[in-house]
């Protein structure tokens, strides 16, 4: 990420919604790209690969800001370790002690793959195709796709799963039954 990006963009404009934080961050990253409006295949590929490499940091740092400012948790920022996988880095950056097990990393890695490969006809893919067809820049396209993930009929379903799990934990005393 650009110098001071985490401090100036993510931490100073934290919010209650991680998807909004990530969308804002993606749009802001476009202002750092001198080739923002170059829609050649080679440039778009470069931009997409760069964004793919930055998404884990945007998610983790957005969550850390939310956790600190909205939930009054301690603030700590861990930089990624280039010798680790994406899943390992996410777990390492999320935890105060940076510790995780190989099993946790494997489970997260599989979950990430499943989320990426769940089908080609979903809302975010459709949104990406529509906005791309207008000739828009990569950052605007990705921000639009992120916005489509937020709705309760798409990515918002994950929020409903979290709410259901909290409700089950609260109301089911013996989970082994």
What do the PLM-derived regions correspond to, one by one?
Residues 1-177:
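Hydrophobic alpha-helical bundle cores within soluble ligand-binding/oligomerization subdomains
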């Amino acid at each position: 990420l650009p110098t001071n990006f985490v401090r100036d963009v993510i931490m100073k404009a934290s919010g209650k919604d991680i998807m909004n934080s990530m969308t804002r961050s993606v749009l802001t990253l476009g202002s750092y790209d001198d080739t923002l409006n170059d829609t050649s295949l080679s440039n778009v590929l470069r931009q997409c690969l760069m964004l793919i490499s930055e998404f884990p940091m945007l998610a983790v740092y957005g969550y850390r800001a939310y956790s600190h400012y909205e939930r009054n948790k301690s603030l700590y920022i861990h930089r990624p370790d280039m010798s680790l996988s994406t899943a390992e880095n996410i777990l390492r950056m999320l935890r105060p002690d940076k510790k995780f097990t190989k099993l946790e990393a494997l489970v997260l890695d599989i979950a990430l793959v499943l989320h990426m490969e769940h089908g080609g006809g979903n809302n975010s893919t459709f949104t990406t195709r529509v906005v791309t067809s207008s000739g828009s820049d990569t950052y605007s396209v990705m921000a639009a796709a992120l916005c489509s993930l937020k709705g309760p009929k798409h990515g918002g379903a994950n929020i409903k799963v979290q709410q259901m799990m909290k409700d089950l934990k609260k109301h089911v005393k013996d989970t082994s039954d």
